[in-house]
UniProtKB/Swiss-Prot annotation:
The lineage of its organism: Eukaryota, Metazoa, Chordata, Craniata, Vertebrata. Its EC number is 3.1.2.2. It holds the Pfam family 4HBT. This is Acyl-coenzyme A thioesterase THEM4. GO terms for biological process: fatty acid metabolic process; negative regulation of phosphatidylinositol 3-kinase/protein kinase B signal transduction; regulation of mitochondrial membrane permeability involved in apoptotic process. The keyword NADP does not apply. The modification Phosphoserine is found at S28, S29.
Amino acid sequence: MLRSCAMRLRTLGATPARRPEATRRLFSSEEVVCKDYALPNPSWTKDLRLLFDQFMKKCEDGSWKRLPSYRQNPPQALQEFQTHFVDSKFKKEEQMSKAQQFTRSLEEGLGFEYAMFYNKAEKRIVCLFQGGLHLQGMPGFVHGGAIATIIDITAGMCAFSEGIVMTANLNIDYKKPIPLLSVVVVNSQLQKIEGRKLFVSCTIQSTDEKTLHTQATALFIKLDPDKPLT
């Protein structure tokens, strides 16, 4: 994942001796006051709204959970992350308080429109993604870097269910281009864990599952709170 994605969607806060508070908060039903951007807005197409409603139905029996998504990390969460993982000489609290998550930094409809759903039993994350007009690469199609980003954060969420992680490796095979404003399904699953290494697979398919746009594998490393990142 991109370095900023290590904190994406998460109310970060971890205590070294137990399950990271960030993970507990994200995958629980704890109320938060930040605006949740993983909810329908006027830019969502009919296809995206339909898929969203279908997955919300799946959430009713508790097998799936919709994950929230925020533009900024709460100040307390940011401070806790920096305390455990950032060397004090590199902390820039005033600047960091103004930082925004990359995937939520564009106006609605222009960039990354998506919602994620988590299945704990299957160790799986499904992301419903609509690429906006400001994500263009070749005319009419989503940029490969934007595709890599949505894979990174979706696969990263699978790994994040096991603790606070960052990307070590991302291997992507681009099969078919994704048209702008189309809706695709990003499906990621945690395959295995070896110590601090977490291996995740990911695919992007059309909503009818007839077109495979992308295949990917990713390796994430669980962060050690005793070893600062900087």
